[in-house]
């Protein structure tokens, strides 16, 4: 084959090949393909990082672990709540109609006798052995101070089954007025609250009483000011 024939064949082959796309349309197509490839690579990289550093994926396992840890705690709280409901408790208030004496009453609003505690002979009867919080409050008041000092006492006593004598558990004395005050002070109304509270080991059938020395000075102007109660711990 001559040289001219070979050159001619090459020229014919070049003419038969498709021409490359040119112009603005081809450039936009290439740009879109490049942008899509970049977004695909960026998304795959982000997903890999999230999985690698535990941002997503293990949350379900962590949630299950948290629920497993909370389950014993919830059971403990439920058991504690149930145990609290089963413990002896009492809260009684003074009867304002009982003139000249401190008479405890269980029939009024916000009073409570639960899980074996009884109110007998103006005393709270303990149903079981154990530690108890014992508390009481009284409120004294007067329109004016008398010419002689007034000493107000409030006492919580225990009559135990293990020994016959009555023993004081808590006691307090207050004097709201001082003798020899001026006429202005004597004419001024006064108020004196006394609160007692403490934790004691008690026995079944122990009897507790809360007493005062001057019931005529008790203030019943508002409900809930004079009360007596126990709570098993």
Swiss-Prot record:
- State one Pfam family annotation: TNF
Question: Topological domain, Extracellular: which ranges?
Answer: 58-233
Glycosylation site positions: 80
Positions of disulphide bridges = 145-177
Q: Where do the TM regions start and end?
A: 35-57
Which Gene Ontology cellular component annotation is one that this UniProt entry carries? plasma membrane
A Gene Ontology biological process noted in the UniProt record is:
positive regulation of apoptotic process
Name where it's found.
Cell membrane
Keywords on this record?
Cell membrane, Cytokine, Disulfide bond, Glycoprotein, Lipoprotein, Membrane, Myristate, Phosphoprotein, Secreted, Signal-anchor, Transmembrane, Transmembrane helix
Does the record's keyword annotation contain Disulfide bond? Answer: yes
Instruction: Report the SUPFAM superfamilies cross-referenced here.
Output: TNF-like
Membrane topology per record: Single-pass type II membrane protein
GO MF, one example: tumor necrosis factor receptor binding
Q: Ranges in the Cytoplasmic compartment?
A: 1-34
Q: This protein's superkingdom?
A: Eukaryota
Q: Where is the THD domain?
A: 88-233
- Which residues are annotated as site, described as Cleavage? 34-35, 39-40, 49-52, 76-77
Residues with covalent lipid (N6-myristoyl lysine) sit at 19-20
Similarity-based family: Belongs to the tumor necrosis factor family.
Q: How does it assemble?
A: Homotrimer. Interacts with SPPL2B.
What is the documented function of this protein?
Cytokine that binds to TNFRSF1A/TNFR1 and TNFRSF1B/TNFBR. It is mainly secreted by macrophages and can induce cell death of certain tumor cell lines. It is potent pyrogen causing fever by direct action or by stimulation of interleukin-1 secretion and is implicated in the induction of cachexia, Under certain conditions it can stimulate cell proliferation and induce cell differentiation. Induces insulin resistance in adipocytes via inhibition of insulin-induced IRS1 tyrosine phosphorylation and insulin-induced glucose uptake.
UniProt protein name: Tumor necrosis factor
Q: Give the organism's phylogenetic lineage.
A: Eukaryota, Metazoa, Chordata, Craniata, Vertebrata
Q: Gene name on record?
A: TNF
